[in-house]
Amino acid sequence: MQQSQREAALAVHAVLDGAALPAALEAHVGRDAGPARAFVQELAYGTLRHHGTLDAIVRAMIDRPIPDRRIAVLVEVALYQLEHTRQPPFAVVDQAVAAAAALANPGAKSLVNALLRRFLRERADVLARVHADPVARWSHPRWWIARL
């Protein structure tokens, strides 16, 4: 799962920088990875689908931006797993911490661990604050929500 989280985070990071997701997945996973590619693809598509909400969750739990955008995206991938998959929370957190060590400096591990564990402890409160904003709740731009 650690490698899957890391690959999904790198693919999502590439998309946020302007790449197409299929090309980003091919670059980070390859074409013939079988079930592993399917899992990474699910994580990447799901994270992008809920990016507005996941980003708002991260912003609600930390006062300043995470310096390394890859780590911020990795946290979003792990939050997606915690909220939208049936994977055990302890496994998601553990693997995200290991993936952070592979992606960035060792200090990133403690940041990822702290954010994810805080989310698990304060889930209801954090989600209530985030869902109060329709942009975060629906993961759509404010202008689009205003038109609806």
Predicted feature locations:
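Class I Rossmann-like S-adenosyl-L-methionine
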Residues: M1-L148
